[in-house]
């Protein structure tokens, strides 16, 4: 498995691929931001030394450079154009932040922490790994539920291991932010003293922290944790996708009944081929809804979720969703996930004899410091009554259709692809005039262990070969473009 993963991601660094999935996608689909350096699952990524105190804008750009995440702001903006709750399925890991005093909503706590804190200067590996091994596909489809649980457990282990490093990075940047604000306040205090205005330095610092520290910290945390969740999801899902596409027999007739609609929209989907029915509490997922979710996944460079029962023959795999201005946005749901971390310290700690208020930010007093709020915090989703406080990755209910109940394979009238199976085909050293259909018929399937022969009187239908499904070319074309194979003559 390690070799397969290494092969997938070895050449991704330093390559600027074209927009994702050019074959079969809508012509008016906007291009996603370019891929940043993905690297290998086993390859460490060490952060540079802690930043120096600089203005918040420069500090934000430094974070993007350190992460290699120049597409971060564009992706944050893209989240404002969607309504789907993409993040509620992720564990919040709020317990990891209960002792992070630099996240306290009391400026006096931040001052005490900032004056005493020493930035972490030892190497910080933001690709740290957990103790759980990457699960391999089972031998039989009856083991798919266990495989799903193993994938979810692996994701949780990797997420928690990496989040410890990201938490340290956030502390280093918050320390640099605090020291810059403190230096600015000291300069203003000296100027006020020279003009004969005696002002309390600590009170000035508290006011500045209340005005700027929390806003800038939330801005840093937003791009930092987007990098964490998106980067880790890409690594794991593309590795799993490469394995799952090689074993279509495991997913024939697979039916998945999800617990909630937010589970369907979650970015991390351990099973990407559901060739039976796809339902949410027994309600079939509409084809357009699946296309809209796949549009989002495509623009975030994540594998698409395929379902033969939900897809319509001849229809594109993705459709741009229509933004509903009166509904919650993906960026707001993401901020709720981040706020669960940022508010963790203040939700359990007390300082200076005060009990931290636990209500939503909208109901807090105007003088109460917080990390911002969004309209999403006031909305009730259709499945809120049954959603646990810590949603996590809930396994779907799985079953399998019998052979006679399985949906027919989807096909399109003509594949839109740059791949030609008959280009420069040479056999036995001689140039042969052969069509793509002939090339497929000529291929010896016995080399792959496929010794089944057609029934008596049955022959291959050349029309079916002439109308190959777009999806047959999608994976090869996608990896050819993403890894720049054509550019290197591969």
From Swiss-Prot:
Region (Disordered) residue spans: 11-35
Keywords: DNA-binding, Host nucleus, Host-virus interaction, Phosphoprotein, Transcription, Transcription regulation, Virion, Virion tegument
UniProt site positions, description: Critical role in activation: 443
Gene Ontology CC terms: host cell nucleus; viral tegument
Binding partners and assembly: Interacts with VP22. Interacts with gH (via C-terminus). Interacts with the virion host shutoff protein (vhs). Interacts with VP11/12. Associates with the VP16-induced complex; binding to host HCFC1 activates VP16 for association with the octamer motif-binding host protein POU2F1, to form a multiprotein-DNA complex responsible for activating transcription of the viral immediate early genes.
Family membership noted in the UniProt record: Belongs to the herpesviridae tegument protein VP16 protein family.
Protein name: Tegument protein VP16
Protein species of origin: Human herpesvirus 2 (strain HG52) (HHV-2)
